[in-house]
Amino acid sequence: MVDLKRLRQEPEVFHRAIREKGVALDLEALLALDREVQELKKRLQEVQTERNQVAKRVPKAPPEEKEALIARGKALGEEAKRLEEALREKEARLEALLLQVPLPPWPGAPVGGEEANREIKRVGGPPEFSFPPLDHVALMEKNGWWEPRISQVSGSRSYALKGDLALYELALLRFAMDFMARRGFLPMTLPSYAREKAFLGTGHFPAYRDQVWAIAETDLYLTGTAEVVLNALHSGEILPYEALPLRYAGYAPAFRSEAGSFGKDVRGLMRVHQFHKVEQYVLTEASLEASDRAFQELLENAEEILRLLELPYRLVEVATGDMGPGKWRQVDIEVYLPSEGRYRETHSCSALLDWQARRANLRYRDPEGRVRYAYTLNNTALATPRILAMLLENHQLQDGRVRVPQALIPYMGKEVLEPCG
């Protein structure tokens, strides 16, 4: 959510943000509704003040005036009730519209849609094979590493790993948590579900509600990232300045409905309903300097993980129309997938300034004693099984086995993933 005072003072800034981010929102209608709310508040205050004055006069009023004062007080009470009802209705409508207002992006963001995304860095390059390489599905089938019957049990976009590949997935998650702990982040294991308020706090609702599965007959929803839970942990608190920044590494199984992705990545591990994710999350003081420092830290953590996994990757500056409505800046990391001959997204590093903090009521007390909204940031540390597809394809050997990166050998106890059976 944006600062309403700033929205009133600088509407042109938000008109531009709405246009550049492609958000369907009538800002003039929102501002008109805001003016109506302000007028209702003013009138309600006037009515309540007069009603209090009338109530004070009644006991001391002469008999010939008392009846009229009582009638006036009753009329004012009825008017106050009508105004309160109208105010509640309009405030609810205004709140719903404010949740849709995007954060203006940083000046360095390319303007446009996905086609305007700009590569800013590349590390490594496509692997060179002396043999015809296999895609990750063929490698799993050749080595007996996945269970094809799982679609009969759990439907499409499900997966089940076996043998060394199952252990490899678990090893990767532990490797990522250990790495983040060494970097000073607090490791946390978290639920895969949360109440609606938490999704509103991150901005997943209302914008991405169709990507989220509801748990029937409850007020809970399945999370697609630990960010949803982490962002809600300190809701309503006023944190001491000395506690900042808060740096969490949260692990949770994640779920996405993949609505709108019909026909995309139907084979293999690239797009599944349930996956596993270690998420980086930072809550820091409200300054661009602090946010920029945290952003670079989150980005460097993810890059170092990919270097340790010995994977070729690139950084992409995300354009205004491709980033989320709450993003100040977004840089995606993409890893090369040999079978497709292109880079595919594995990480998304985001700075959201106070957009989430206002929605989730995340505050701190600054050194001058003022209560302020914090800034939040997040980035993937590692997510499986998508990263497994990259590891299998980039590290495959001529005999169909797959080598283990040096950093993962202590977790696996071997240098090569062996076939099942």
Swiss-Prot record:
Keyword Cytoplasm recorded: yes
Disulfide bridges in this chain: none
Binding-site positions, ATP: 256-258, 272, 345-348
CDD domains for the chain: SerRS_core
Principal subcellular localisation of the protein: cytoplasm
Stored InterPro entries: aa-tRNA-synt_IIb, aa-tRNA-synth_II, aa-tRNA-synth_II/BPL/LPL, Ser-tRNA-ligase_type_1, Ser-tRNA-synth_1_N, SerRS_1_N_sf, SerRS_core, tRNA-bd_arm
SUPFAM superfamilies: Class II aaRS and biotin synthetases (SSF55681), tRNA-binding arm (SSF46589)
Domain of life per record: Bacteria
Keyword terms, alphabetized: Aminoacyl-tRNA synthetase, ATP-binding, Cytoplasm, Ligase, Nucleotide-binding, Protein biosynthesis
EC code(s) of this entry: 6.1.1.11
Gene Ontology terms: cellular component: cytoplasm
Localization of this protein: Cytoplasm
Pathway membership, UniProt: Aminoacyl-tRNA biosynthesis; selenocysteinyl-tRNA(Sec) biosynthesis; L-seryl-tRNA(Sec) from L-serine and tRNA(Sec): step 1/1
Complex formation: Homodimer. A single tRNA molecule binds across the dimer.
Record remark: domains: Consists of two distinct domains, a catalytic core and a N-terminal extension that is involved in tRNA binding.
Family the entry assigns: Belongs to the class-II aminoacyl-tRNA synthetase family. Type-1 seryl-tRNA synthetase subfamily.
Protein task: Catalyzes the attachment of serine to tRNA(Ser). Is also probably able to aminoacylate tRNA(Sec) with serine, to form the misacylated tRNA L-seryl-tRNA(Sec), which will be further converted into selenocysteinyl-tRNA(Sec).
Protein name: Serine--tRNA ligase
Designated gene of the protein: serS
